[in-house]
Amino acid sequence: MAHTVKIYDTCIGCTQCVRACPTDVLEMVPWDGCKAGQIASSPRTEDCVGCKRCETACPTDFLSIRVYLGAETTRSMGLAY
Protein backbone atom coordinates (compact mmCIF):
# COMPACT_ATOMS: atom_id res chain seq x y z
CA MET A 1 0.00 0.00 0.00
CA ALA A 2 1.59 3.28 -1.10
CA HIS A 3 1.15 6.57 0.67
CA THR A 4 2.51 10.10 0.49
CA VAL A 5 5.09 11.11 3.06
CA LYS A 6 5.88 14.76 3.63
CA ILE A 7 8.80 16.22 5.53
CA TYR A 8 7.74 19.29 7.49
CA ASP A 9 9.90 20.44 10.37
CA THR A 10 13.53 20.26 9.32
CA CYS A 11 13.26 20.21 5.55
CA ILE A 12 15.15 23.28 4.35
CA GLY A 13 13.94 23.00 0.76
CA CYS A 14 17.40 22.42 -0.72
CA THR A 15 16.17 19.72 -3.19
CA GLN A 16 19.28 17.57 -2.65
CA CYS A 17 17.16 14.51 -1.82
CA VAL A 18 15.08 15.00 -4.97
CA ARG A 19 18.18 15.24 -7.16
CA ALA A 20 19.79 12.20 -5.49
CA CYS A 21 16.85 9.84 -6.07
CA PRO A 22 17.59 7.48 -8.99
CA THR A 23 13.94 6.47 -9.38
CA ASP A 24 12.38 9.94 -9.23
CA VAL A 25 10.29 9.12 -6.14
CA LEU A 26 10.63 12.54 -4.50
CA GLU A 27 9.48 15.96 -5.60
CA MET A 28 9.28 19.40 -4.02
CA VAL A 29 5.81 20.79 -3.38
CA PRO A 30 4.72 24.22 -2.11
CA TRP A 31 4.17 24.37 1.64
CA ASP A 32 3.53 27.49 3.68
CA GLY A 33 4.18 25.69 6.96
CA CYS A 34 7.97 25.70 6.68
CA LYS A 35 10.67 28.30 6.32
CA ALA A 36 11.65 27.32 2.77
CA GLY A 37 8.10 27.51 1.42
CA GLN A 38 8.47 24.05 -0.11
CA ILE A 39 8.92 20.54 1.20
CA ALA A 40 10.00 17.18 -0.13
CA SER A 41 7.13 14.83 -0.84
CA SER A 42 7.15 11.23 -2.04
CA PRO A 43 4.04 10.62 -4.14
CA ARG A 44 5.55 7.62 -5.93
CA THR A 45 6.65 5.47 -2.97
CA GLU A 46 5.95 2.29 -4.92
CA ASP A 47 8.99 3.11 -7.08
CA CYS A 48 11.37 3.41 -4.09
CA VAL A 49 14.18 0.84 -4.27
CA GLY A 50 15.51 1.56 -0.77
CA CYS A 51 18.92 2.80 -1.88
CA LYS A 52 18.90 5.58 0.76
CA ARG A 53 20.61 8.07 -1.57
CA CYS A 54 18.06 10.66 -0.47
CA GLU A 55 18.97 10.04 3.17
CA THR A 56 22.67 10.43 2.42
CA ALA A 57 22.07 13.64 0.46
CA CYS A 58 19.98 15.31 3.19
CA PRO A 59 22.13 18.01 4.86
CA THR A 60 19.92 18.19 7.95
CA ASP A 61 20.22 14.46 8.68
CA PHE A 62 16.46 14.35 9.08
CA LEU A 63 15.49 12.17 6.16
CA SER A 64 15.38 8.52 7.15
CA ILE A 65 13.99 5.64 5.15
CA ARG A 66 13.59 2.10 6.45
CA VAL A 67 12.75 -0.41 3.80
CA TYR A 68 11.56 -3.90 4.67
CA LEU A 69 11.64 -6.08 1.59
CA GLY A 70 8.72 -8.42 1.22
CA ALA A 71 5.03 -8.15 0.49
CA GLU A 72 4.85 -4.56 1.72
CA THR A 73 7.45 -1.81 1.90
CA THR A 74 7.35 0.38 4.98
CA ARG A 75 8.94 3.82 5.01
CA SER A 76 9.51 6.32 7.75
CA MET A 77 10.61 9.87 7.10
CA GLY A 78 10.31 11.11 10.63
CA LEU A 79 6.63 12.07 10.65
CA ALA A 80 3.20 10.54 10.48
CA TYR A 81 1.96 9.41 7.09
From Swiss-Prot:
Places the protein is found: Cellular thylakoid membrane
TM spans (from-to): none
Membrane topology summary: Peripheral membrane protein
Chief localization: membrane
Pfam families: Fer4_7 (PF12838)
Enzyme class: oxidoreductase
Binding site for [4Fe-4S] cluster 1: 11, 14, 17, 58
Binding site for [4Fe-4S] cluster 2: 21, 48, 51, 54
Catalytic activity: reduced [plastocyanin] + hnu + oxidized [2Fe-2S]-[ferredoxin] = oxidized [plastocyanin] + reduced [2Fe-2S]-[ferredoxin]
Domain 4Fe-4S ferredoxin-type stretches: 2-31, 37-68
Name of this chain's protein: Photosystem I iron-sulfur center
